[in-house]
Regions:
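N-terminal export signals
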Residues: 7-26
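N-terminal maturation segment of proteins
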Residues: 26-603
């Protein structure tokens, strides 16, 4: 199993068979607390402990450990999850405090969804995480991407012991790669082969890493920089591990993927997989935390997309853009020099500065939207060039609990022309504050198990991030009738229309059997982009079935609950209290947000 930055807080891969498993397997449910479950999970996923900054004290031994990505390791994790479910049920039904019961109940929802996914013996089922995929390795999945990013961004090196732990994890990486390769071989035997265009992109990204000299690789240069003041030949040791272990393991994985490529077809959707329709139904349920069918999601996406385009049309006309479809006019606006950045490194620097400015502007406005504030500790960083080819435009998430590792807003700067001055503001609010980084810090105030399972509720997390974009507008960032203000409102509506369009193409690809070309053409017209410009997005949907649907489902539900509370409470409704309730309750199924709204109405 592999991890994204956010998923480090919410995914596990087994390295040990915990002592609780034999008792659970015999039908005896051992007495447990939510802290017991959290501690066990961290020992299954030591990288998560490091990312959270809690691999200290009793958990200090985890800093040099790595998760087990082999078939046996994944099977152990599955066994642990199945064993944890009755233990959590006992906590919910037992005499404990309300906070522990709620945390256990939320964790139950996450673990049950993951356990349902184990019925499909291929790909990667996240354990209370959002990144489910039918392919073990792809252009945006695999330790070839995640391990360098983790070691560089999250593994601290302040002491000799820290540096040795870094070396230990680097030395364990070949075993992780080989574990993934073994699962790729097993999936090949099941007929699970990624689309040809996905394999081409994946092998291309791997070749970028493989083509570097060991001394220049991120995971070597990062250690050399971090350990500069610590006596030892750290860089030389890392280079030897890379040359003797990592590169041969990467070669073995690439060789297996090349075998996959000889068998690959262009079919893009999950429907082609063993039990493909059932797999997609599960993936859609995992992503939305609802029972919406593909047809319902598809229809809702079309409806919302049309509504946002009607609003965009009015703004475009006010800006003098009156001819052609909304998509065609947005393509024209994308080239307007008033809203573009320079090419090359100059434009990349401009974009980073622009984002920092938007963060500085929104920060003092946030007390208007919340009674309870968090730090909003965020750093803006470029996605590594080797990852950019298969990465989305941006992503973000919180840092460590103690704040020593900041939250990150990762921005794809492969081509500065992909970003404009009217779409970057709303993207910033989505990924940084008051979006993912902001929400993640509230989630870290929960009991530890609640923090760990938060990644399992994509509809809430992404719904909140879209709601954060909405909050920014409500806080006045687009007030006024200047061209810049109108363009900013247009960027926000375009973001919403973009997420509505995702619902259409995701269900189109996986349920309606759209080809990649049909999905790209529809999406390009719907979003005002080019076919080339939307290709990475479409390819992402191909390998993460259902995930793209959670955004608007979650955003719509949060707004539905807000309107319900306003109608029921009248003058008692408190805007800031509602926002506190939604974000302070942590990442959870949408049904829990509805329950919390009921309590707010009745209070």
């Amino acid at each position: 199993m592999t991890f994204s930055r956010r998923e480090m807080l919410a995914a596990g891969a087994g390295s040990t068979l915990l002592a609780t498993l034999p008792s659970t397997a015999r039908g005896v449910i051992p007495a447990s607390t939510i802290d017991d479950v959290a501690d066990e999970w961290l020992r299954l996923s030591p990288e998560a402990a490091t990312s959270l900054g809690i691999d200290t004290g009793a958990l200090a031994d985890l800093r040099g450990q790595s998760s087990d990505a082999s078939p046996a390791g994944v099977a152990r994790v599955h066994a642990w999850v199945r064993g944890a479910i009755p233990r959590l049920q006992a906590i919910v039904a037992g005499p404990g405090d309300a906070a522990s019961k709620r945390t256990a109940d939320v964790a139950l929802a996450a673990y049950r969804t993951s356990a349902d996914g184990f019925a499909f013996p291929y790909g990667d089922v996240s354990i209370a995480g959002w990144r489910n995929g039918p392919y073990v390795v792809a252009q945006n999945m695999g330790s070839y991407l995640d391990t360098p990013k983790f070691l560089d961004g999250d593994h601290p090196v302040k002491t000799t012991a820290d540096a040795e732990a870094y070396i230990a994890r680097l030395a364990a990486w070949p075993k992780q790669l080989d574990g993934e390769t073994a699962r790729l071989k097993a999936d090949r035997g099941r007929g699970v082969i990624a689309p040809d265009f996905i394999l081409d992109k994946t092998l291309g990204a791997m070749a970028l890493t493989r083509g570097e000299a060991p001394a220049q690789m991120l995971f070597v240069t990062s250690l050399a920089k971090k350990a500069a003041g610590i006596p030892g030949d750290w860089a030389a040791r890392a280079e030897r591990i890379v040359a003797s272990g990592v590169m041969p393991a990467l070669d073995r994985q690439m060789a297996e993927l090349k075998v996959h490529r000889t068998l690959a077809k262009p079919d893009a959707g999950a429907w082609k997989l063993p039990q493909g329709d059932a797999y997609y139904a599960w993936a859609l349920r995992a992503a939305t935390t609802t029972r919406m069918t593909p047809e319902e999601v598809h229809a809702e996406g079309l409806r919302q997309h049309a509504d946002y385009h009607r609003q965009m049309d009015a703004i475009l006309q006010s800006m003098g853009l009156t001819q052609g479809s909304v998509g065609a006019r947005m393509r024209a606006l994308n080239k307007d020099p008033r809203f573009t950045f320079a090419a090359g490194d100059t434009g990349r620097a401009q974009i980073l500065t622009f984002i920092e400015g938007r963060i500085a502007d929104i920060r003092p406005r946030l007390p208007i939207a919340f009674h309870t504030l968090v730090r909003g500790n965020v750093e803006v960083r470029r996605i590594a060039p080797a990852e950019e080819i298969g990465a989305p435009g941006a992503y973000g998430g919180p840092g460590s609990i103690d704040g020593t590792i900041p939250g990150r807003f990762w921005i794809n700067l492969r081509d500065p022309a992909r970003h404009t001055k009217y779409n970057l503001p709303t993207l910033t609010y989505h990924e940084a504050i008051p979006g993912h980084v902001w929400q993640g810090e509230y989630n870290q105030k929960l009991p530890l198990l609640g923090t760990l399972v938060g990644g399992g509720f994509s509809a809430y997390q992404e719904g909140w991030a879209l709601y954060a974009e909405q909050l920014a507008g409500e806080l006045g960032v687009y007030d006024g009738e200047s061209v810049e203000a109108r363009a900013g409102r247009l960027g926000y509506l375009d973001s919403m229309a973009f997420r509505a369009a995702r619902m259409v193409v995701d269900t189109g690809i996986h349920a309606k059997r759209w080809t990649r070309d049909k999905a790209r053409e529809w999406f390009a017209e719907a979003t005002g982009d080019t076919v080339e410009g939307v290709t990475s997005e479409i390819d992402r949907y191909c390998v993460w079935p259902g995930q793209a649907c959670g955004y608007k489902v979650g955003h719509s539900e949060i707004n539905r609950q807000r309107e319900r509370a306003k109608a029921a409470m009248g003058t008692r409704f408190d805007y800031r209290a509602f926002n506190d309730m939604v974000v302070g309750g942590g990442s959870r199924p949408l049904s829990f947000v509805a329950r919390d709204t009921d309590r707010m109405i009745g209070s």
